[in-house]
Amino acid sequence: KRFVFPFPVLNDKKITGYILSKYRLKTINDVLSICPNGLYPFAFFFNGALISCDAIKQIGNVDKNFFIAGEEVDYFYRLRAVGKVLTDMNAHHYHPNVYERTWSDLKIYYYTKNTIILNKRHLNMATLRNIFFAVVATFYRIFLHNGWTGIISYLYRNNLKFLVIAIQRGLNGRVGIDFLDKK
C-alpha cells in the first residue's frame, strides 16, 4: 500500500531537498529497505505524532503565523533542533487522500510563500535556483490538485499577480495572514 505522503530520501545530514526531491519512499517496504529497524529519521506532522512534553517546553507551540501551509514543516525542524524526530513504521494511521481536494487561491498563495520562507529559515536555501524550484513545486502541486486548468489560470489570469506577491513576501520572510493585504 502506498503512502499518502511519500517519505523523502535523506542525505548524510538527514536533510531532504524538500521542494522537489525526485527520490521518494512510497511504501513501508521502501522505508524498511533502507531503515530495517523501522525508525525513520523524518516525520510528517501532525497525524499520529507523539511529542515529548520536554521538547514542547523547549520550542513552544506551533507557529500560527504559518497559516494554512508550512506549520508542520516548521515544527518538525524546530523539534529536530532539540532532539531526534522519528517515524515508527509499525505505527499506522489513516489519512484521506489529499490529492482528491482542489486547492484554492488562498492555499496556493500560502503554500508558495511559506515554502520559500521555510527553505530560507531551516535549510539555508535562499538561492535563486531554490526559489525557482519552489515555484516549480507550486505549479506541480497546482497540477496535482487542480489539473491543467488550474495551471493555466495562474499563467493567464489575475492569479499570476497573487503568485508574484507570494514569492516577494516569501523572499522578505513575511509570515502571517496577509492574503488580502494590498502592500
List PLM regions with ranges.
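Acidic/His-rich active-site region of diverse nucleotide-sugar glycosyltransferases
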Residues: K1-I59
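A short, conserved alpha-helix in the catalytic core of glycosyltransferases
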Residues: A43-I51, A55-N61, N65-H92
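Short helix-loop capping/hinge motifs at secondary-structure junctions, enriched
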Residues: K57-Q58, N124-A126
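Residues that scaffold the ATP/ADP-binding catalytic core of kinase and kinase-like folds
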Residues: Q58-I59, P96, L118
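Short glycine-enriched, charge-decorated loop/helix-capping segments at active-site entrances
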Residues: N65, R101-D105, S153
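Short acidic, glycine/proline-rich loop/turn micro-motifs
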Residues: N97-R101, N146-G147
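Non-catalytic, C-terminal membrane-associated alpha-helical segments of glycosyltransferases
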Residues: L106-N114, M125-K183
